[in-house]
């Protein structure tokens, strides 16, 4: 009775108790676990079907099995608050301050008018419905606590599913077998696991590993040999795949966090000395094997800490994740109460990409909790924290019970994934979220009497769960039909499917049908950027309205204002219809590329501009128009000068403003371009008039020597410039007198040269030089110099400079 009084979850028994067999609650939890794991195995492709199966499972359980106990009112109120807060984004935007970028969207004719805060209201409604289903399933699970013995086998079922997932993933990776429920057509599919992101798979395996620890502890103390024999290898498979097959550094880090969390909160009565000793020995053994073995996860952790050989930065330096965090905070600043709407982060984030500017638009902020705040608002985030806090606080009253190690292992497995959610998005994939939800419900539901109060509160909850079950069952059936029976897909998946249908219609020459389908879909999927592109292309290819095509393309660019690829692709589409529209689009692409490069997204604007010029050469007007954009940077001006036959280098050299902007490297490129273009006399006069340029002109001077066949002089100039050692090592007399040549290649060559065996020396060098190894090329140059063949020596030296990234000559 004292234990029950200490736990706020325990309800006093009424006088009209009816026997209620506990196996029904166990059966309800088993159904939820099976539904969640089915969703996990289908998460790589059949997303609607995966959620549909879980909803059908949860719906049937709610309809068939009345709750074993009354769920406390505070949980209902907090869940209702979370749901209500997440729906605030469906309020009119006019009720709140409107960000400037949103006002800018009103200028685009092709973009439909959206009076709500959410730019994709149908998608937001879909995700709100899924959130409601998740909360209902979670509350239902709390209403079905199970006895310790049943919890052991339900947890074992989940663990075996995790181990099976890991085993199948290992088999697929090692044999090349294609898992039938994983779509690898994404832009960067992981090479291990069947989620689209390595961290999703890692989070699943971390939860399984921690779950296994609780089961092993329970099986050992409770003398359950079968459970022990199944849990130990399952633990091994999960941990082994995490450490040596997965490349997720977060998986390794949060495995350590989860194990520590489990051990720390076990309590003194359960944290025995044998347990601690065995844990330390096991952890030390696993850590030693991990550190001495080769694995991508280990390499990525070392690089992240600045310890890897290829690491160019230390902890957090240049980390894109922190930049995305920063930009996401600006979204939260603009939408603190309502959020932007569930499911809209990827649509809104391009307007906030400053620190994290890149061509690729993140579809999440690298944090589940930040995503909740950005999409649902700060109130929803605080309510979620409050709900989690109450649940964990309430379950801690059971820490002195015999089943606490297993219960806490299940809690720790779920909490570890949630902690991982601060720096990544494991629950962003909702199919994994169902598994975490089921784990939390299994562990956080406190055990009740084996009888149920048939009070008014119980009857109300029974009715609510029955209605929710019917709704979930119907929704699950609809999702399954959408996935596998060709029904219309739900909004998050509808837009991309329509885009594919439009492409198919255009491929069949049915442009008018494609145009009609595109216009009809705009109001339903207003933020699907590909829809505007395909609509514009349909108008162009079908001899439709060029004005409509322009408007559609403008809307696509407006929805991703940082992209360089979108205006470039649009320029390509216009080339066969109206090439005059291509130049300004490519100019926009060039400007966006420059901004991305300045933000550290990707480099080599010069190479990008050069590709544009190469594509434009067959079109003189386009080629000439691109020259106007060379003023973006001196580097581009130099590329333009080298490419355009109409530019006179002498005229450019008389522009002091341009010359003053040049860095030493740009000066060198300018002189090389001038030398290659001709006008050697004017170039020589320029250098005589500007002696401060002489140092940057040395590649030109070397080329002038080569044109005069002064190879020895050119070699000497390069030798001085790069401080090269073009001599063989001096060997000790005892080495020269020995019968065995040295092992080192340069010493070996010196050995044969000193003994007058130049033929063998050249043979020793030949293999290394043919493989373009720098040392072999350097030695070939030295041997050629010794033989008096300066031209051959220069050829070898130039190859050496190219291989060492120093061969930049006209």
Descriptions of predicted regions:
Residues 13, 20-45, 51-64, 83-86, ...:
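Alpha-helical transmembrane segments of multi-pass inner-membrane proteins
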Residues 190-194, 258-259, 288-327, 333, ...:
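Flexible juxtamembrane loops connecting transmembrane helices in multi-pass membrane enzymes
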Residues 197, 315, 322-362, 369-372, ...:
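TM-adjacent membrane-interface loops and short helices in multi-pass inner/ER membrane proteins
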Residues 274-291, 456-484:
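Internal/C-terminal transmembrane anchor helices
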Residues 492, 526-527, 561, 594-603, ...:
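Short coil turns that delineate tetratricopeptide repeat
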Residues 499-500, 530-534, 564-570, 601-611, ...:
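Alpha-solenoid helical repeat scaffolds
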Residues 513-519, 546-557, 581-594, 618-633, ...:
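Alpha-helical repeat scaffolds
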